[in-house]
Amino acid sequence: RLSPSEERKSGYYDWLVKRHMAKLNARYIGRLHSSGFYLWANKKADKLSDLKGLKMRTGSLYDRFMRALGMVPVTMNSPEVHTALERGVVDGFGWPNMGPRQRGWIKKAKYVIDLPFFGASNVVALMNLDKWNGLSKASQDKIIAITEKYEPGMVAHFKSGAAAEWKKLDAAGVVRYTFSDAVNKQYLDMAYDLEWKNLAKKVPGDVDTLRRITGN
């Protein structure tokens, strides 16, 4: 839930650098994109239980959350979604706010739960570690400095773009909605708690550190 600048201050950025070196032989440089994710469907849910049984185009990002909500995740490539919505193969999808209008998906799935989750996009800049180590210290420092300077403007750019896109979505008839404060919290807590449980299985020794440096 941290901004890229906050990640650098908290120690999470340094953790990512070490992790990518150890696991991928890559130098983590920084984030290139910032966006929340949403669940879109062909009907409005008055309560969380109304989401049960909905067939949703998914990706690894959404799978656990959708299953916990009682949805039925359906894996398919994004070019197939439009036809799948028209034929009733899926009732909705998980996606940021940028894209569904352009792809025509909102014609069949115009209801979106306006509670963004996982705001830190996984679109990041990496460099092969051997290539990175072949650069001069001055070049390395310059790359990091440029990226660090770029990130706040990048976040502002995507926030502005998202706000502009919501205006177009509203005009196109998209219905944004939430639940009660208590249910909104339950919804978002579920999304994050599931990922923490998954991390506890994958990297049990790192979870306490990750919670501390991410403020979660």
Feature locations, PLM:
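Aromatic- and glycine-rich peptidoglycan recognition patches
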Residues: 11
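Active-site-proximal, glycine-rich beta->alpha crossover segments in alpha/beta enzymes
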Residues: 7
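N-terminal secretory/targeting leader peptides
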Residues: 1-3, 14-216
